[in-house]
Every structure is written in structure tokens, then in C-alpha cells.
Amino acid sequence: FYGDQKRAPEGPHLLKKDGWYYLFEAEGGTGEGHRITVSRSRTLMGIYEPCPYNPIMRQWLPDAPIQRCGHGKPVMTQHGDWYIVYLCGRMIDQKYSMLGRETALDPITWTPDGWPVVNHLQGPGCQQKKPLPEIPYYSKDKDTGFGTNFLSCDFMTPRTPTLHGIQIQNGILTLEGSHADL
């Protein structure tokens, strides 16, 4: 299967739902044409028919904050609500994405004829309502205890930080900002 738009399909995700195999793909390269399309078949090996609503996720507005949406994976909550987790970028001057690819989440609704539609085909949402009760990531009452020369796991970072500008003395953590490229 060469994708709906036949332009660089990649990153497939399969979902079996209600007797259908759904194939979610990223298409259009990783630039401004990046999008999520879906096709389905009654059998795993196809023939797959493209969704009449494709692309089910794409940013159509060139000045919108979220761009380059692709690589969507559908997920269902324990309450039966559907969402799509996907990659995107927040662009600066329509050229750069300071944080690279970010992860986003938007709701999926299913049409009466069984097709997934993301965010009512309005493109990526900037905010979503939380369907679950808030669970704090950390306790506000927790004592971080800067009494040692080491930071606890609560201060882990997704990248290897430079340790320049970080000091722990007399139970006080001091962080000095720096000029650094991401």
C-alpha cells in the first residue's frame, strides 16, 4: 500500500476495530505538508481503501502555532474515548522548531460509517480538556532535601544537562541560566 497521497508514506500503525483493520500513516514528508492519513480493510493483507476524510490530521493554516503533524497512533481510554497521539512542531518564524518534534494529543470521533475523524477535521488543537481527574506529578509537600551533593530523580531531564551553573550548598539549590542551543 503506497498511502493515500502516494507521497512518502511512513510510520504505519495498525488498529483492529469492529472487524476492520485501520492503517494510520504519516505522509507528505516532515515539513509543512506532514499529515496523518488512514485506510482500512477487512483483511490484514488488504486491499486497503483510503478514508474519504483524508488527511484526518493536517495543519492547513500557515501561521498557526502547531505545524508538521504526523505519525499518529490511535489510543482508547478506559472509558471508551478515543484519542490520537502524534508528533508535531511549534514553529518560530515558520522556519524553526526550537523543541524539535513534540508529542500532541487530539480527540478522535468515529463516523457512522466507521471512519476516524480527528478534532472534527479542524487541525491540531492547542489545548484539550482532561477526561480524567488531575493527578499531581509531584507532591507540593515533598522535601527535596538538598542536604546531599546529589540531586534526586525528581530533577531528571530528557537531555543530558551541563552541570555548569548547578550548585548545592547548605541545603540550597542554585541554578544559573546559560546561553545554550537545544
Residue ranges: model-predicted function:
Residues 1-182:
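Carbohydrate-active catalytic/glycan-binding domains of CAZyme proteins
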